[in-house]
C-alpha cells in the first residue's frame, strides 16, 4: 500500500471554509479518479503559528503506477483550481510513502 501525503498550511481565517471545501468538493473529485482506494485528513497539532494551521491529507493507493498517473495527468489541473481559489493563503508539500 502506498500513501500519497499532501501537507497543507492554510490561513486560519479561511480554515473552516477550506476544510469544508476539501471534504465536499476537492477530495471527492480525486476519489472519483479511481487512483486511490481511501483517504484521510488530519490536523497537525505541533509547529503551529498564529496565522496558519496545517493539515495532512492522505490518499491511499495500491500501485505506484496509479500514483504516478495521478501526479502527471490529473493533479496539475486540480492544483490550478486550488491555487485559483486560495491563491497566496496556503502552502503545500507532497510526500510519497510505502508501507513496510
Feature locations, PLM:
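Alpha-helix boundary/capping residues
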Residues: 25, 73-74, 85
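Short amphipathic alpha-helical segments
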Residues: 15-41, 77-80
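Glycine-rich beta-strand-turn "strand-cap" elements at beta-sheet edges
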Residues: 40-50, 81-100
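Short, well-ordered beta-strand segments in beta-rich or mixed alpha/beta enzyme
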Residues: 3-9, 42-73
Amino acid at each position: 500500500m502506498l500513501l500519497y501525503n499532501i501537507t497543507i498550511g492554510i490561513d486560519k481565517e479561511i480554515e473552516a471554509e477550506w476544510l469544508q471545501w476539501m471534504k465536499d468538493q476537492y477530495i471527492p473529485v480525486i476519489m472519483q479518479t479511481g487512483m486511490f482506494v481511501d483517504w484521510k485528513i488530519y490536523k497537525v497539532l505541533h509547529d503551529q503559528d498564529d496565522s496558519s494551521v496545517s493539515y495532512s491529507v492522505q490518499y491511499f493507493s495500491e500501485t505506484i503506477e496509479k500514483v504516478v498517473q495521478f501526479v502527471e495527468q490529473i493533479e496539475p489541473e486540480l492544483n490550478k483550481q486550488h491555487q485559483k481559489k486560495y491563491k497566496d493563503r496556503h502552502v503545500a508539500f507532497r510526500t510519497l510513502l510505502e508501507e513496510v
